[in-house]
Every structure is written in C-alpha cells, then in structure tokens.
C-alpha cells in the first residue's frame, strides 16, 4: 500500500540496497567517535526515505538501547540539530509537533497553523490528529479552540477534522451551485455570511474548488481572491486566501512561503525546516520549479546564500540540486 506521505515529485526516494543495521551502526560510530562525523550523518539521513529512517530508528534503539533522536540532540545543536531530528521523526508526529509549537507560549503562529492545515490531505490530518493526541493527551481540536477564536477558529477546526473531499472527480452542477452560494454570501448581500465560505472552501476537493472559482468569476466578474479580500479580514481572510492558493497550486503556495522565510534580513528557520522536510518526499521538485518560475532564481541558490555550515549542507542535500 502506497504511503499517504509519499508523492511522485519528491527529491528523496527509497535507498536501494538499504540495510537498517549497517546504517544504525554507521550512525552510532559517527556520533560516538572522537568529534561528530556530521558528513556521515547527513549523507545517511538525507539519502534514505522516511520509512527507511523509521527502520533505522527501531534498529538503533534495539542495538544500543538509546533513542536516536536523543543522541542526535545530545551531539548536535541549533538549526542543524532541528533538521536532523525532524528527519528521523515520522511525518504525522512531525506535523503534530509543529502544530503544538505554533500554539505554545505567548502568541500563536497563525501562519504556521494555516500552512500546515491547508496543505495536508484529509487522511494525513486524521493521522496527525491521532499522533497529536498520543503525544499530548489532548485533542488537536481542543488546543486550536483555546488558542484561536471566531470564524478563524471554526474554519481551522473544520480543516483539522480532515473532512475535505479527496475525490478527483468534479461536479459541474455543484460548482455552479457553490459559486452562487459564495456570491450570495459575500458580494451579493449586505454583510457577509462567513459560515458559507468556510463550508465550501474547507470541505470541497481542490479540483472541485478550481471549477467553482471559474464559475464564480462567470457570475461575479471577479476573482474569488478579490472578493475574499473585500469581504473578510484578519486571520480568517489569510486562511481562506491560503486555501484558494493551495487549491489552484499547492507547490506555488509553498514556494511563496519559502521565499518569505528566506528573504530579508533574518531567516525563518522554523518555516524553512518544516517545508523542506515535510515536502521532501511529496512535491519538493514542483516547489523548486515554482520558486524559480516566480522569483527568477533557484531555491537551491536562495538556501545557499541564506544559511551556513552543516545546516546549509543538510538543506541543500534535501533540496537535491540547483535549477
């Protein structure tokens, strides 16, 4: 059975001739030797798929009675450590931890919440919610409820529920009906019916939404994005615009997130690490393509000029190559 965490356009694939015991031993030597052998760690962890890394983690635990992630944490530091630990974490658990991190402490990282909840499939969301509950003994929905409010909260909870239709079939009649519902809920009435926007944008499949946006343009002579900007505001507006962007082109949405993370004075490593790791086996090739198309330079060169040391090396290995 194909994993829901693997797509055809990743930069990292299964390693042929893979042996968990050989890799676990090599990693142990790299960590335990005099000084850490970062090169070996990077090469092994970026040249194995996540499924293979999980087998290394099991083998490592069985052979050395140590958690690989704990040994990595003890031996590495900074952003480099964060990426390496992310690489040995199962995808659903990684996303669960990222969601927790975005809601922890003072202030919520709404952009991270939006990015994760809009780009994961319904089946992925169900696994993430399970992982979240297993680790934190609280439901993801409960934490979202206590950290957000209003229409933004309602929409996030709908996405977190993993109820978006996943079928690739489109229904023209439904698209016309939904387009009219959106038009009546916004442009065509005094005041806005936010629930209708949430219902359509959070539950319909992406191919279905694309058709709905075309129908919307026919009815209103406006792009749905312009109506959302005119009718809504705040984080709820940001969330719905993100859904529209993802429905049209998820890799382009994530390329824009990476561009924002890398441009300007500081680097947003939290976002950079999350997207590079979580999309490395799904669609990072497409994200690279969109990045180059929109910004005129490659993602590889952006990472190269914005990061340094082992952290740069591991990100470039995940990225794959220059475009």
UniProtKB/Swiss-Prot annotation:
<dbReference type="GO" id="GO:0010595">
    <property type="term" value="P:positive regulation of endothelial cell migration"/>
</dbReference>
<dbReference type="GO" id="GO:0019834">
    <property type="term" value="F:phospholipase A2 inhibitor activity"/>
</dbReference>
<keyword id="KW-0597">Phosphoprotein</keyword>
<dbReference type="GO" id="GO:0062023">
    <property type="term" value="C:collagen-containing extracellular matrix"/>
</dbReference>
<dbReference type="InterPro" id="IPR018252">
    <property type="entry name" value="Annexin_repeat_CS"/>
</dbReference>
<dbReference type="GO" id="GO:0005886">
    <property type="term" value="C:plasma membrane"/>
</dbReference>
<comment type="similarity">
    <text>Belongs to the annexin family.</text>
</comment>
<dbReference type="GO" id="GO:0043312">
    <property type="term" value="P:neutrophil degranulation"/>
</dbReference>
<feature type="modified residue" description="N-acetylalanine">
    <location>
        <position position="2"/>
    </location>
</feature>
<dbReference type="GO" id="GO:0030670">
    <property type="term" value="C:phagocytic vesicle membrane"/>
</dbReference>
<feature type="repeat" description="Annexin 4">
    <location>
        <begin position="249"/>
        <end position="320"/>
    </location>
</feature>
<keyword id="KW-0593">Phospholipase A2 inhibitor</keyword>
<dbReference type="GO" id="GO:0042581">
    <property type="term" value="C:specific granule"/>
</dbReference>
<dbReference type="InterPro" id="IPR002390">
    <property type="entry name" value="ANX3"/>
</dbReference>
<keyword id="KW-0111">Calcium/phospholipid-binding</keyword>
<keyword id="KW-0007">Acetylation</keyword>
<dbReference type="InterPro" id="IPR001464">
    <property type="entry name" value="Annexin"/>
</dbReference>
<feature type="modified residue" description="Phosphothreonine">
    <location>
        <position position="267"/>
    </location>
</feature>
<dbReference type="GO" id="GO:0006909">
    <property type="term" value="P:phagocytosis"/>
</dbReference>
<keyword id="KW-0106">Calcium</keyword>
<keyword id="KW-0677">Repeat</keyword>
<protein>
    <recommendedName>
        <fullName>Annexin A3</fullName>
    </recommendedName>
</protein>
<dbReference type="GO" id="GO:0005544">
    <property type="term" value="F:calcium-dependent phospholipid binding"/>
</dbReference>
<dbReference type="InterPro" id="IPR037104">
    <property type="entry name" value="Annexin_sf"/>
</dbReference>
<feature type="repeat" description="Annexin 2">
    <location>
        <begin position="90"/>
        <end position="161"/>
    </location>
</feature>
<feature type="repeat" description="Annexin 3">
    <location>
        <begin position="173"/>
        <end position="245"/>
    </location>
</feature>
<feature type="modified residue" description="N6-acetyllysine">
    <location>
        <position position="177"/>
    </location>
</feature>
<dbReference type="GO" id="GO:0045766">
    <property type="term" value="P:positive regulation of angiogenesis"/>
</dbReference>
<dbReference type="GO" id="GO:0042742">
    <property type="term" value="P:defense response to bacterium"/>
</dbReference>
<dbReference type="Pfam" id="PF00191">
    <property type="entry name" value="Annexin"/>
</dbReference>
<dbReference type="GO" id="GO:0005509">
    <property type="term" value="F:calcium ion binding"/>
</dbReference>
<dbReference type="InterPro" id="IPR018502">
    <property type="entry name" value="Annexin_repeat"/>
</dbReference>
<comment type="function">
    <text>Inhibitor of phospholipase A2, also possesses anti-coagulant properties.</text>
</comment>
<dbReference type="GO" id="GO:0048306">
    <property type="term" value="F:calcium-dependent protein binding"/>
</dbReference>
<feature type="repeat" description="Annexin 1">
    <location>
        <begin position="18"/>
        <end position="89"/>
    </location>
</feature>
<keyword id="KW-0041">Annexin</keyword>
């Amino acid at each position: 059975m194909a994993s829901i965490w693997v797509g055809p356009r990743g930069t990292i694939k299964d390693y042929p001739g893979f042996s968990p015991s050989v890799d676990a031993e090599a990693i142990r030597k790299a960590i335990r030797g005099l000084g850490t052998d970062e090169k070996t760690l990077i090469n092994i962890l970026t040249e194995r798929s996540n499924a293979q890394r999980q087998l290394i983690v099991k083998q490592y635990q069985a052979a050395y009675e140590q958690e690989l992630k704990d040994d990595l944490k003890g031996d590495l530091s900074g952003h480099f450590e964060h990426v390496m630990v992310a690489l040995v974490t199962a995808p659903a658990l990684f996303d669960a931890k990222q969601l927790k991190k975005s809601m922890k402490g003072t202030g919520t990282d709404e952009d991270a919440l939006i990015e994760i909840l809009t780009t994961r499939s319904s089946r992925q969301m169900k696994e993430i919610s399970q992982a979240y509950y297993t680790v934190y003994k609280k439901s993801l929905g409960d934490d979202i409820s206590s950290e957000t409010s209003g229409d933004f909260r309602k929409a996030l909870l709908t996405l977190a529920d993993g109820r978006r239709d996943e079928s690739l079939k489109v229904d023209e009649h439904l698209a016309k009906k939904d387009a009219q519902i959106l038009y009546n809920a916004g442009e065509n009435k005094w005041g806005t019916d936010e629930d209708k926007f949430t219902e359509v944008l959070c539950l319909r499949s992406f191919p279905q939404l694309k058709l709905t946006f075309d129908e919307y343009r026919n009815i209103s002579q406006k792009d749905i994005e312009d109506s959302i900007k005119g009718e809504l505001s705040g984080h709820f507006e940001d969330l719905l615009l993100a859904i529209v962007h993802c429905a049209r082109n998820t890799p382009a949405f994530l390329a824009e997130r990476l561009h924002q993370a890398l441009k300007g004075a500081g680097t947003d490593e939290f976002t950079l690490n999350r997207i590079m790791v979580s999309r490395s086996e799904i669609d990072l090739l497409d994200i690279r393509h969109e990045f180059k198309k929109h910004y005129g330079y490659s993602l590889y060169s952006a990472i190269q000029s914005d990061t340094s040391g082992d952290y740069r090396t591991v990100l470039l290995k995940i990225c794959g190559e220059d475009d």
